[in-house]
Curated annotation (Swiss-Prot):
A Pfam family of this chain: Rhodanese
Annotated coiled-coil segments of the chain: none
Protein name per its UniProtKB record: tRNA uridine(34) hydroxylase
SMART domains in UniProt: RHOD (SM00450)
Function text: Catalyzes oxygen-dependent 5-hydroxyuridine (ho5U) modification at position 34 in tRNAs.
Keyword Cell membrane: no
Recorded catalytic activity of this chain's protein: uridine(34) in tRNA + AH2 + O2 = 5-hydroxyuridine(34) in tRNA + A + H2O
InterPro entries assigned: Rhodanese-like_dom, Rhodanese-like_dom_sf, TrhO, TRHO_N
GO MF, one example: oxidoreductase activity, acting on paired donors, with incorporation or reduction of molecular oxygen
First-tier enzyme category under EC: oxidoreductase
PANTHER family: RHODANESE-LIKE DOMAIN-CONTAINING PROTEIN 7-RELATED (PTHR43268:SF3), THIOSULFATE SULFURTRANSFERASE/RHODANESE-LIKE DOMAIN-CONTAINING PROTEIN 2 (PTHR43268)
UniProt keyword terms in alphabetical order: Oxidoreductase, tRNA processing
Biological source species: Rickettsia conorii (strain ATCC VR-613 / Malish 7)
Active site positions: 178
Length: 247
């Protein structure tokens, strides 16, 4: 029986002084361990998704943690019959998720996590609004029943949407959601920085929610868009193959 391919996604907002210096080290261990995928490095932290054997993707993650020294890392592992990535890339970026807002310190200043098991109960409270921080083409594929779609083409447009919708957000508990946690985490930092106090985000994102809850209350509708060769997954995390997902 062939071993399943492990797909590991990990991110952390942590100060990295010289991220460019880490690139050759990560490429070396990744290629030695036959790992494929993409790792983004920036002064604000790292964000990566890569595939290989379970042992090898964890060895690459261990090296990444050793080189960057984060206090905590958000990690998610799924499995596939094939590699969803073609090769290994390690890239230097200004931000690990581009918002184009200077001065955010997400590591120290962000909203509160809501565990997947508590999410359904939390978002059905009357004073809670849910904001899907993903792009509109992702939301089209699937989202939560009550979620607001900001109709953004890129994450860089999200800060402008917030500025234009302050009356909508005023006096509410704001619950952010995204695929794996990183965009909603950075979004909470933005909202906290401009004065919103009750800001929350789904820990581990939609993928962790679907794995932990199996969508038992049917608050999630549709599939979840993913940025690899699977294109989207169902609420049991099975890959979706449909012509309209070929972008």
């Amino acid at each position: 029986m062939n071993e399943k391919i492990a797909i590991l996604s990990a991110y952390s907002f942590v100060n990295i002084e010289e991220p460019a210096n880490l690139i050759p080290k990560l490429l070396l261990i990744g290629k030695r361990k036959y790992v494929r995928g993409t790792i983004l490095l920036a002064n604000e932290g790292f964000n990566g998704s890569f595939s290989g054997s379970y042992e090898n993707v964890n060895l690459v993650l261990e090296e990444l943690i050793k080189l960057t020294g984060p206090k905590d890392v958000n990690v998610k592992i799924n499995y596939s019959d094939v590699h969803p990535f073609q090769k290994l890339k390690v890239r230097l970026k200004k931000e690990i998720v581009a918002m184009n807002v200077d001065g955010l310190n997400v590591d120290l200043f962000k909203g509160e996590y809501i565990e997947p098991k508590d999410w359904d109960e939390f978002i059905t409270q009357q004073d809670v609004i849910v904001i899907d921080t993903r792009n509109d083409y992702e939301v089209e594929v699937g989202t939560f029943k009550s979620a607001i779609n900001p109709n953004t083409k890129t994450f860089k447009q999200f800060p402008a949407w917030v500025q234009q919708n302050q009356e909508l957000l005023k006096g509410k508990k704001i619950a952010m959601v995204c695929t794996g946690g990183i965009r909603c985490e950075k979004s909470t930092s933005l909202l906290k920085s401009i004065g919103y106090d009750e800001v929350y985000h789904l820990k581990g994102g939609i993928l962790q929610y679907l794995e932990d809850t199996q969508n038992k209350n049917n608050l999630w509708q549709g599939e979840c868009f993913v940025f690899d060769d699977r294109r989207a997954v169902t609420d049991d995390l099975s890959p979706v193959e449909r012509h309209w997902l070929q972008r």
